[in-house]
């Protein structure tokens, strides 16, 4: 449980730092790199600090107990939070937590496999319907796979395909070019691979709520970068924004894939705001936002990984049945816990 709380705290602090840094960027600047840097750091740092920069709750409890309390309420609360016996009781639920962890990972994995199977069926059906005709089809210079309802989206890891539903082909040529260019930009930038690799962290750590948020921010950054590239190539951001709204209305009943023209759920308003009416930063904000972001990063780098027992690899367990004590333990929790060295 300590590890879960620490990993989420690190991810949330790093995510806030990335959010502030992203906010300080010009509206047309690439954003994905911020999250591509923060996400690996939030994964690697807790594991590295576990072995090289740990903080023992048992030692902190002894030091706190030896000091005069600041007050009855604050003294009792601080001793409770640092009591290894209390944390050891929480650790007794680790078996149940691990079972939930494996169950959630299995459900997410099955959901991902089901989505891949569904896309594979759509591709096979499209190939059969084309018959002897060229597959995939080429529309406005972009190679596409025409579907009944799925899309617009880019799918595939090794070989990306642009999926467009039939109603996209009926759009006016200018609007259709925006849709196809958006998906083609996703394909050229290998956004599908990026989001697939990033989503693996969710399968491995479904309890990491901070990672869910980081992945969502990465998806938004990928879509905003793609919007900027499309507007730079084709121009007229107002027409492009109107198309996004129209596509959202037309595709509301179809399955949602990533990366896609509509992006993640609930991100369309943010994309339109940045694209059509970006809020200019004041001079103070341009310096203050990066400074606060660096401060959060410094806090994370200074925050050790908490462990129950003494030493970076020690942990505390509850004794069952009879009381077992370690050599010269603190009398306040000697009857409840035993410190085992790995």
Q: Where are the predicted features?
A:
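Residue-level signature of catalytic and energy-coupling elements of molecular machines
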Residues: 34, 226, 272
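Membrane-helix interface segments
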Residues: 28-32, 191, 283-287
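Active-site-proximal gating segments in proteases and membrane effectors
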Residues: 140-159, 209, 213, 233-292
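Post-HEXXH active-site segment of zinc metalloproteases
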Residues: 189-223, 238-247
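Hydrophobic membrane-embedded segments
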Residues: 1-128, 133, 137-143, 268, ...
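An active-site-proximal "capping" alpha-helix that borders the catalytic cofactor pocket
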Residues: 135, 177, 220-235
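Peri-catalytic and regulatory segments of divalent metal-dependent proteins
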Residues: 103-196
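Internal/C-terminal transmembrane anchor helices
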Residues: 39-41, 280-306
């Amino acid at each position: 449980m300590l590890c879960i709380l620490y990993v989420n705290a690190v991810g949330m602090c790093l995510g806030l730092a990335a959010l502030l840094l992203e906010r300080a960027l010009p509206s047309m600047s690439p954003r994905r790199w911020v999250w591509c840097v923060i996400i690996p750091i939030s994964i690697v740092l807790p594991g590295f600090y576990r072995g090289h920069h740990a903080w023992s709750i048992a030692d902190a409890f002894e030091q706190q107990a030896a000091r005069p309390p600041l007050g009855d309420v604050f003294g009792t609360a601080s001793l409770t939070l640092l009591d290894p016996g209390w944390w050891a009781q929480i650790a007794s639920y680790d078996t149940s937590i691990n079972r939930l962890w494996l169950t959630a990972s299995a459900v997410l994995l099955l959901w991902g496999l089901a989505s891949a199977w569904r896309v594979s069926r759509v591709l096979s059906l499209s190939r059969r319907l084309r018959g002897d005709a060229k597959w995939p089809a080429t529309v406005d210079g972009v190679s596409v796979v025409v579907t009944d309802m799925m899309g617009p989206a880019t799918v595939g890891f090794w070989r990306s395909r642009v999926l467009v539903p039939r109603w996209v082909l009926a759009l006016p040529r200018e609007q259709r070019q925006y849709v196809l260019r958006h998906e083609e930009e996703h394909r050229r930038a290998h956004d599908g691979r990026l989001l697939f690799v990033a989503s693996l962290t969710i399968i491995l750590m479904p309890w990491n709520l901070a990672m869910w948020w980081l992945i969502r921010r990465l998806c938004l950054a990928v879509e905003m970068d793609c919007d900027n590239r499309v507007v730079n190539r084709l121009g007229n951001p107002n027409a492009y924004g109107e198309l996004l709204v129209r596509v959202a209305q037309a595709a509301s009943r179809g399955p949602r894939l990533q990366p896609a023209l509509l992006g993640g759920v609930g991100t369309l308003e943010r994309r339109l705001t940045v694209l059509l009416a970006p809020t200019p930063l004041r001079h103070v904000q341009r310096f203050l936002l990066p400074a606060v972001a660096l401060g959060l990063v410094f806090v994370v780098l200074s925050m050790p990984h908490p462990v129950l027992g003494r030493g970076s690899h020690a942990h505390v367990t509850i004794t069952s049945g009879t009381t077992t004590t370690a050599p010269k333990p603190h009398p306040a929790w000697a009857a409840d816990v035993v410190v085992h060295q790995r």
